[in-house]
């Protein structure tokens, strides 16, 4: 899908049967979720963001469904203010940031001496003329 940025890009994700809302965050390296129980082993990790550093549990090879697309990757679980899907999973989804096509550049044209540009037929005008 194409998502505009007039609102936060929040999507529904499914992690181990648990439905959550998460923010698609191209500025985040990692995916961080809170209040979620994941099976398997985890490793402790510290991550830093604008709000400082937080301690998280790192789970590898986690299956997540994002907007109906299944991906497998590393998920960090900890006290994040908002669940974020970082670049580690966005790249697997094939997400890209696209900028609109820039305005068409004009090319200056040199006219032959004595020419004052192209002649354009005048459209029919009403009484004002």
Language-model-detected regions and their locations in the chain:
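A detector of low-complexity, intrinsically disordered, Ser/Thr/Gly/Pro/Ala-rich segments
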Residues: 1-2, 10, 104, 124
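Aspartic protease core domain of the pepsin/retropepsin superfamily
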Residues: 18-22, 26-127
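Residues embedded in well-ordered secondary-structure elements
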Residues: 2, 11-12, 53, 64
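A short acidic-Thr-Gly-centered motif at the start of a beta-strand
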Residues: 8-20
């Amino acid at each position: 899908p194409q998502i505009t940025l007039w609102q936060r890009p929040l999507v529904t994700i499914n992690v181990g049967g648990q439905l959550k809302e998460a923010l698609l965050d191209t500025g985040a390296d990692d995916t961080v979720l809170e209040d979620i129980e994941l099976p398997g082993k985890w490793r402790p990790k510290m991550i830093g963001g604008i709000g400082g550093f937080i301690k998280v549990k790192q789970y590898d090879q986690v299956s997540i469904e994002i907007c109906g697309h299944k991906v497998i990757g590393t998920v960090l679980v900890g006290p994040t203010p908002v669940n974020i899907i970082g670049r580690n999973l966005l790249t697997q989804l094939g997400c890209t940031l696209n900028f609109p096509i820039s305005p068409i550049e004009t090319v200056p044209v040199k006219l032959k001496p004595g020419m004052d540009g192209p002649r354009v037929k005048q459209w029919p005008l009403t009484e004002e003329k």
